[in-house]
Amino acid sequence: MDAKIPPLTPFKKPSGTSLLILLILLLGLLCLGFAQILDLSSISLSLLFPLAVSAICSAILGYVVVPVLRRLKAGQVIQEDGPQTHLKKAGTPTMGGIFFVPVAVIIALIWSKLDPAVLAVSIVTLAYMGIGWIDDWQILRQKSNKGLTPRMKLILQIAIAVGFCIWTFLTQSADLTNIALPGQIILPLGLFFWIIAGFVLVAESNATNLTDGVDGLAGGTGSLAFLGLAALMASNNPGLMIFCACMSGGCLGFIVHNRNPATVFMGDTGSLALGGSLGAIGILSGHVWGLFLVSGIFFVESLSVIAQVSYYKATKGPDGKGKRLLKMAPLHHHLELSGWAETQIVGLFYLINAGLAVLAVISS
């Protein structure tokens, strides 16, 4: 009998609580590190206070909302063709985005004294949350994994993106269309910028949605991404800095309930809101390059799906079947089927995203 070779994984399997502690430490270290990188001694407290308040409020509210979702039987429907280990998660409450996203938005609006930029981004965030809620509700009603049709969801996402781009075009400086790249390179895009802006909003919301497939993954990486953007806002946009810090804290508070084994999932209600929010902030602040870096995990997850589908279609034979690059897309499912534990994947992605946040601040 052949000996079984254990799967190659980067480190021992951590617990969900260990990952929560890791996330808290990473966020704290990033706050301190950003103060040194940007030479702004006050930035640490400016980031930590709204982050902590939002995290605590979201975590506390979760203890009220999660039992309500459970009583309403708002349980997640698990895809049968997904990883078999996920079948045991069937029935776990979903739509968790309804408690941590509004909390973060409300705290940000109050803290920033209804800053116009924060108000605009808040509207986009809640609008994308609304799309996600409709999708989640349809799934729960039909007791299947099919909510809004992909076409209808895309139409709604594009409509919000167009509305936001029109508002930004009418209210912001024309200099916004010049994208700053590393090495003091300025890329003047003119009207083409708005096509990219619309694409970024839609793509970012879908990318975070794809990443939300493992306990603690989308919320934790989202928290780190928002904190990276917050640091980029520190010198010239305190309102958006506060908003990003609050969203980072909201995600952290959600992880209290979503860490492995999760007692609630954010659903499309949360994941679409996170992506739409990140995209809107990156566009409105002019930090498109920084957005690309802090969203590196989301980008790779999306790219893995695109590559999987494209390769399958390109290699399709007479029998209608093609070949697959990955065992399953997105990438986190491929790693699961390769023998990685969920918590190993999440821990590694947290560390990578923290590094990307630092890189974004250094290179912007």
Curated annotation (Swiss-Prot):
Q: Where is the signal peptide?
A: none
Q: Which GO terms describe its biological process?
A: cell division; cell wall organization; peptidoglycan biosynthetic process; regulation of cell shape
Its placement in the membrane is given as:
Multi-pass membrane protein
The UniProt keyword set, sorted, is: Cell cycle, Cell division, Cell inner membrane, Cell membrane, Cell shape, Cell wall biogenesis/degradation, Magnesium, Membrane, Metal-binding, Peptidoglycan synthesis, Transferase, Transmembrane, Transmembrane helix
- GO cellular component annotations, sorted alphabetically? plasma membrane
Instruction: Specify the superkingdom.
Output: Bacteria
* Gene Ontology MF: a single term: metal ion binding
Question: What residues form the membrane-spanning segments?
Answer: 18-38, 48-68, 91-111, 114-134, 154-174, 183-203, 214-234, 237-257, 280-300, 343-363
Which chain positions lie within coiled-coil regions? none
* Cofactors demanded by this protein: Mg(2+)
* Protein name (database record): Phospho-N-acetylmuramoyl-pentapeptide-transferase
